[in-house]
């Protein structure tokens, strides 16, 4: 009787838990008795993953927090190394969390275990020399976007482009009016979605120029509605404070819901750069991108950056599809004229391009990831 397929897997945060869930489902569709062990969240555990530690152990953000938790993180890594070297899996998958997973992958690879890193770090954008560490730690990288694979190919590092899970999750056509009904927004009004970031540091720097841009838009379009996506109560309160200090005369509808629903309900979007820009492209809404970090971080990022663009739609297209304003340019003097241009345009060519790009990265990423891993360990795959 053949031994069941055994896969080691570690996810470090909620987004990784979702990726892990889809990956496990896709493997089990082909190998129902496959076993999964490592670290997972509630979704992975529900799919049968044996989690040796609580996923919260790895979910630390920021240098100070990481330093405070370093002894515990090192202990978790040592325990996982001991477990996997004593009970070698057929393959180990590290999902995102590169600071933790790449170190773990390197040690496991040195011990003869095949390793895969799922979700490429942004080596194509900055600190490209990290690719040599990734090469030393992995047998394969699974990349969401085609330009990521092109970058790895340049360095002869094994990588497969699997498409993006967001492109699978978001339908090709989204329903603006259904989203408005869901969020309780007036149907017959024009809405601008405002997304000033999900982290406190982002909102602190970006909310004010975004609100001041809305002030200028309101003068030109007095009937325009402004709807803000807040990821949690803290961000809601933070935005409200800045709004009342900056433009108390304006009306913002603040909604604690997914950014996706808020963007879908809108006619246009003013957003902070990040994955949300890709999501906006996938819901086919025209956008203007603004982003700001503190001056020192911005200076360092500029020195280490190797890409012309910051927002993913532009990086993916290899040209400027959407206007982006970074650092000092994240200011109403720049944001307002760009936003006016979007509001006064029918944007049909842009939406057409967004649709084409959506199709380009919609490949059933869960299944592609499973098949790539199965090929690596010489297992048959369902194509």
Swiss-Prot record:
* Catalytic activity, EC: 2.4.1.182
Q: Which GO terms describe its molecular function?
A: lipid-A-disaccharide synthase activity; phospholipid binding
Keywords assigned:
Glycosyltransferase, Lipid A biosynthesis, Lipid biosynthesis, Lipid metabolism, Transferase
Superkingdom as given in the UniProt entry: Bacteria
Which pathway is recorded for this entry? Answer: Bacterial outer membrane biogenesis; LPS lipid A biosynthesis
One Pfam entry name: LpxB
Q: Which enzyme class, named as a word?
A: transferase
Q: Which reaction does it catalyse?
A: a lipid X + a UDP-2-N,3-O-bis[(3R)-3-hydroxyacyl]-alpha-D-glucosamine = a lipid A disaccharide + UDP + H(+)
Give Gene Ontology CC terms.
Answer: membrane
Q: Name one GO biological process term.
A: lipid A biosynthetic process
InterPro entries, A to Z: Glyco_trans_19 (IPR003835)
Q: Which residues form a coiled coil?
A: none
Q: What is this protein's function per UniProt?
A: Condensation of UDP-2,3-diacylglucosamine and 2,3-diacylglucosamine-1-phosphate to form lipid A disaccharide, a precursor of lipid A, a phosphorylated glycolipid that anchors the lipopolysaccharide to the outer membrane of the cell.
The Swiss-Prot or TrEMBL record describes its family as follows:
Belongs to the LpxB family.
Give the protein name, as stated in the record.
Lipid-A-disaccharide synthase
Q: Which organism is it from?
A: Aliivibrio fischeri (strain MJ11)
Q: Which gene encodes it?
A: lpxB
């Amino acid at each position: 009787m053949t031994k069941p397929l055994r896969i080691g897997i570690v996810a470090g945060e909620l987004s990784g838990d979702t990726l892990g869930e889809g990956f496990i489902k896709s493997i089990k569709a082909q190998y129902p008795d496959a076993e999964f062990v490592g670290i997972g969240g509630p979704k992975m555990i529900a799919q049968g993953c044996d989690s040796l530690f609580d996923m919260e152990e790895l979910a630390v953000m920021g240098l100070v927090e990481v330093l405070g938790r370093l002894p515990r993180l090192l202990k978790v890594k040592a325990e996982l190394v001991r477990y996997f070297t004593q009970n070698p899996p057929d393959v180990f998958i590290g999902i995102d969390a590169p600071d933790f997973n790449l170190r773990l992958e390197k040690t496991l690879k040195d011990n003869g275990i095949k390793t895969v890193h799922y979700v490429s770090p942004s080596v194509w954008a900055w600190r490209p020399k990290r690719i040599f560490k990734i090469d030393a730690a992995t047998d394969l990288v699974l990349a969401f976007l085609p330009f990521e694979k092109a970058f790895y190919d340049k360095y002869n590092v094994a990588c497969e482009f699997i498409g993006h899970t967001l492109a699978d999750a978001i339908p090709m056509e989204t329903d603006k009016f259904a989203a408005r009904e869901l969020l309780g927004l007036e149907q017959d009004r024009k809405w601008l979605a405002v997304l000033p970031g999900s982290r406190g540091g982002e909102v602190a720097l970006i909310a004010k120029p975004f609100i001041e841009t809305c002030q200028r838009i309101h003068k030109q379009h007095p009937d325009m509605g402004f709807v803000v996506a807040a990821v949690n109560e803290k961000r809601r309160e933070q935005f409200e404070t800045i709004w009342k200090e900056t433009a108390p005369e304006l009306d913002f509808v603040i909604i604690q819901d997914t950014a996706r629903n808020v963007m879908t309900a809108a006619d246009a979007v003013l957003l902070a750069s990040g994955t949300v820009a890709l999501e906006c492209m996938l819901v086919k809404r025209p956008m203007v991108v603004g982003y700001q970090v503190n001056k020192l971080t911005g200076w360092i990022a500029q020195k280490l950056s190797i890409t012309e663009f910051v927002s993913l739609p532009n990086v993916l297209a290899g040209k400027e599809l959407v206007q982006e304003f970074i650092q000092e340019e994240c200011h109403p003097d720049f944001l307002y004229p760009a936003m006016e241009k979007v509001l006064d345009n029918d944007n049909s060519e842009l939406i057409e391009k967004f649709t084409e790009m959506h199709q380009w990265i919609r490949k059933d990423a869960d299944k592609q990831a499973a098949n790539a891993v199965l090929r690596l360990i010489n297992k048959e795959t369902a194509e």
